[in-house]
C-alpha cells in the first residue's frame, strides 16, 4: 500500500505519525463528522477538504498535531475557544479529541454557525460545545468571553498580528493563544513581535511540522499574556484587519 493510500484513511499510520490514537468512539465521531460535512456542503460552503487525505491530513491531523500536550491530558477540564471556526476545524475535532474540554466556536457567517450547531448535536457534543455567531472583535469585548479561556486558537483566519489581537484578550492569566500557520518567515516574526508589545503578550513557542504524505509544512505559535490585555483591544470591527498592530 502506498503512503498516499495509508494516509487517505484513518489507519494506524496516520495516528502513529501524530503520536496519539483515538478511542473507537472518537474515531467513529471523526468519521461521522466527515459524513456531516459532505451533507452540509450541499447547502453551505463549509470546506472543500472532505475526502481522503484532504480530510484526514489537511483537516484532522493538521488540527491536532499542535496539541500534543493537551492530548496527553485529554480528560483535564479546560475552556477553549476557536475563532473563525468555519467548517469546525480545529474546534469540533478538538471537542472530539479532548473530552474534558468545553469548546466555544465563533464564526461571523450565520449559515456556518447553524451548520456547526447541527453537527455538534449530531455528534453528541452539545453539552460541551457552544456556538457564537458574531465577529471576533465583539467576542473579545464580551464579558462572557474576555479573559476566561485556557486556550484560544485560530486557523487560517488572517495574518498573525490580526489573529493575536483577536485571541490574546480572551485568555485567562495562565492561558495560551495558539496560532495555526502555514508559511512562517523572519519578517512574519518581526510583525508579530511588534503587535505583541501592544497586547502585553509574548511568543513562548514556535514549532515547525511537515505534514504526512508531503502535504506541506505547518507552524504553530503559542502566545501567553505577560500582563492583562489593555481594554482597548480588540479594536472595533474591521480595524484590526485594516490597520494591524505595529504596521
Curated annotation (Swiss-Prot):
Binding site for S-adenosyl-L-methionine: 84, 89, 136-137, 155
GO molecular function: rRNA (guanine-N7-)-methyltransferase activity
Enzyme class: transferase
Cellular component aspect of the GO annotation: cytosol
Localization: Cytoplasm
Major location (coarse): cytoplasm
Assigned EC number: 2.1.1.-
Record bears the keyword Kinase: no
Keyword Endoplasmic reticulum attached: no
Sorted UniProt keywords: Cytoplasm, Methyltransferase, rRNA processing, S-adenosyl-L-methionine, Transferase
Alphabetical list of InterPro entries matching this protein: rRNA_ssu_MeTfrase_G, SAM-dependent_MTases_sf
Domain of life: Bacteria
HAMAP family, per the entry: 16SrRNA_methyltr_G (MF_00074)
Protein family membership: Belongs to the methyltransferase superfamily. RNA methyltransferase RsmG family.
Function field: Specifically methylates the N7 position of a guanine in 16S rRNA.
Protein name: Ribosomal RNA small subunit methyltransferase G
